[in-house]
């Protein structure tokens, strides 16, 4: 990280705590990279017919979950054994919430891979191009959130929230289109699956926004 999370701890006497926290922050960045890869693979499955990717996503998800549990356990250990001061509590609680957001994005990516397998039974829908654009925007939000994390950007929340507005607009527009088509006589399943896709993407974007806002909180101590 350009500026280490552990540097938010100002007491120079607690070198052990700082070293342990550096290990945690490296795990957080590794987890973030795995979630980015999982999200990218779900896009390939949905829009490029790369149907081998759902199995790869499932393998990534195992490592994501392992890191999530490990980071939570480390943070919980700090909270119970290190007698953290108020600034420590802010940092540790933000990290625990942040990795929870990453874990949820990973879960949604795995779900998208499974939905992609089901959609192969149907011809491509005209809405898929717009859904792909929505997916790219959500991925960009995650990328930006993780960049902000490495740089400890105090403006992270504001930057990514503006990007989230684009995803929300796309969701509203696509949902109305799909809801109308659901009422037309014909095959309903692909419409419902695409509605689930855009809902997952909207939630993934929300979690990316949460990550950015938690970065701002770590740096400034102010909630957005």
Swiss-Prot record:
The disulfide bonds in this chain are none
Would you tell me the protein name for this molecule?
Answer: Phosphate-specific transport system accessory protein PhoU homolog
UniProt record similarity statement: Belongs to the PhoU family.
Subunit and interaction comment: Homodimer.
List the keywords (alphabetical).
Cytoplasm, Phosphate transport, Transport
Pfam families attached to this UniProt entry: PhoU
Q: Which GO terms describe its biological process?
A: intracellular phosphate ion homeostasis; negative regulation of phosphate metabolic process; negative regulation of phosphate transmembrane transport; phosphate ion transport
Under the heading InterPro entries, the entry gives: P_transport_PhoU, PhoU-like_sf, PhoU_dom
Q: Name one GO molecular function term.
A: protein homodimerization activity
Biological role:
Plays a role in the regulation of phosphate uptake.
Give any Gene Ontology cellular component.
cytoplasm
Q: Where in the cell is it found?
A: Cytoplasm
Q: What is its main location?
A: cytoplasm
């Amino acid at each position: 990280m350009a500026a280490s999370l552990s540097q938010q701890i100002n007491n120079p006497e607690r070198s052990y705590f700082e070293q342990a926290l550096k290990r945690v922050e490296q795990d957080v960045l590794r987890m973030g990279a795995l979630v980015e890869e999982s999200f990218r693979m779900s896009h390939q499955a949905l829009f490029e017919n790369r149907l081998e990717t759902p199995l790869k996503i499932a393998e990534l998800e195992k490592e994501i979950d392992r890191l999530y549990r490990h980071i939570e356990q480390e943070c919980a250990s700090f909270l119970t054994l290190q007698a953290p001061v108020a600034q420590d509590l802010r940092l540790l609680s933000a990290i625990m919430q942040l990795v929870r957001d990453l874990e949820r994005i990973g879960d949604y990516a795995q779900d998208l891979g499974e939905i992609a397998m089901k959609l192969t039974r149907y011809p491509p829908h005209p809405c898929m191009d717009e859904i792909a654009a929505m997916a790219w925007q959500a991925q960009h939000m995650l990328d930006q959130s993780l960049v902000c994390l490495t740089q400890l950007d105090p403006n992270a929340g504001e930057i990514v929230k503006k990007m989230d507005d684009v995803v929300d607009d796309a969701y509203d527009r696509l949902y109305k289109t799909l809801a109308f088509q659901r009422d037309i006589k014909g095959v309903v399943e692909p419409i419902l699956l695409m509605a689930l896709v855009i809902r997952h993407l909207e939630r993934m974007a929300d979690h990316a926004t949460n990550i950015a806002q938690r970065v701002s909180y770590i740096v400034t101590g102010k909630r957005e």
